[in-house]
A protein has these predicted regions:
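Gram-negative host-targeted secretion-system effectors, predominantly Type III and Type IV
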Residues: 1, 32-35
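Intrinsic-disorder-associated, low-complexity terminal segments enriched in Asp/Asn/His/Tyr and depleted
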Residues: 2-5, 17
Length: 392
């Protein structure tokens, strides 16, 4: 064979070998693509737990024969064991009642003396701890509708001022949340449907508002709109910060019942907010109250109002992570804390986390058939939920 012919033949074989390699690589690539498209990353399903019958966890905070007791909020003092609770003698409207626990919610005092004006409260009271720029600590208590009024205490709740208006504006569930901003200010969140913001008594669109305090909660600015929605009725916003402190989220009730609950985020200390979007069914309900557990998870107490939920109207809790909120995931656990015998009337805050990691969550509900609602606390630890989930 001629040498030149041999070189041509060798080159021809090389071309064939290269084509085989290319074809093989192409087949492998196609197989990889098909394999990826046919498989999804494993996502653990939401686990439903039920503590309703675990009566050893339950403590009656207050109950009165024939009397509606509702809508409590709580605050944990710095000693890690004193919890204060306020709640109305009636459905939102009614005299503000006040109790104290000095042992982390295991036992509660008798009803404590309150200022005369607290008997005139028109709406659900809320209580918060604040600190002014000088470092002095205060307790502030709000009572809503028109006008929003406030009382404060300078001695850890031993004595209180009368209720006085904070401005010429009103609102509903004032204040649903209080956020300590990085500059030392406080941002209070409430909502209105047009009736009380200017006392016009004319229902219109729902708006979530904020008011700011520069002096530790003693005085407040005029309200500004945080978010609204063209179709949904957003209200009762529960605030929580990201673990790194850079982002604030508001978890909101949707009052028209046409949507799931909503969430919005701010990365500039509440100056601007993302477009509100729906949350998963597992977080759909009313009056979300969130606290971080000692292991970094989120515990959110709320009234279950998810469509077709077997626990609709009951007191439930959601356990998950901040990332679950951001990514719209279902979370780790959904826990029925107590069966409400009414279709919907139950479950406002609060949620406190003790130094040993115990969660003390307190709310009202129709806990007995044909009886008005009363106030109950439940104590639990996230590790106990983990153990319960493993036994399923």
């Amino acid at each position: 064979v001629d040498k030149s012919d041999s070189n041509v033949f060798t080159q021809f074989l090389r071309i064939i070998d290269m084509r085989k390699i290319c074809y093989s690589l192409l087949i492998l690539l196609l197989m990889a693509i098909v394999g990826c498209s046919g498989s999804k990353p494993h996502v653990k399903p939401l686990i439903n737990l039920d503590l309703d019958q675990d009566v050893a966890r339950q403590v009656v905070v207050d109950k009165e024969q024939g009397q509606y007791l509702g809508h409590p909020t709580t605050v944990l003092l710095e000693d890690g064991k004193t919890i204060l609770v306020v709640y109305p003698k009636g459905h939102g409207r009614g005299a503000i009642l006040y109790k104290r626990s000095t042992d982390g919610g295991r036992t509660w005092s008798q009803r404590l003396p309150t200022p005369k004006s607290w008997e005139t409260s028109l709406e659900t009271p809320t209580i918060f701890r604040t600190q002014d720029p000088s470092g002095k600590k205060h307790l502030v208590l709000f009572s809503g509708l028109y006008p929003i009024r406030m009382a404060h205490s300078e001695d850890d709740g031993q004595t209180w001022t009368e209720l006085e208006k904070i401005g010429d504006f009103g609102g509903i569930v004032a204040m649903s949340s209080l956020v300590h901003l990085k500059n030392g200010d406080y941002m209070a969140i409430f909502h209105d449907d047009g009736r009380f913001i200017r006392n016009e008594n004319k229902a219109s669109k729902f708006y979530v508002y904020k008011a700011l305090s520069h002096d530790g909660g003693l005085t407040w600015t005029a309200p500004e709109v945080v978010v609204t929605h063209d179709s949904a009725q957003l209200c009762e916003a529960g605030a929580v910060r990201s673990p790194d402190g850079r982002t604030i989220a508001l978890l909101m009730r949707e009052n028209s019942r046409k949507f799931n609950s909503f969430i919005t985020f701010s990365t500039d200390e509440g100056q601007t907010w993302s477009t509100p979007r729906e949350m998963p069914t597992s977080l759909t309900g009313d009056r979300h109250t969130a606290q971080y557990t000692r292991d970094g998870r989120l515990f959110v107490s709320f009234r279950d109002m998810a469509k077709d939920s077997p626990t609709k109207g009951d007191w439930v809790a959601w356990v998950g992570t901040w990332r679950d909120l951001v990514e719209g995931k279902e979370g780790q656990y959904r826990v029925r804390l107590k069966d409400n015998k009414n279709q919907w009337d139950s479950t406002y805050p609060g949620v406190e986390v003790l130094p040993d990691g115990t969660i003390v969550t307190t709310t009202y509900g129709h806990w007995a058939e044909n009886e008005p609602p009363y106030i109950v606390s439940i104590r639990l630890k996230p590790t106990e939920l983990d153990a319960l989930a493993r036994r399923r």
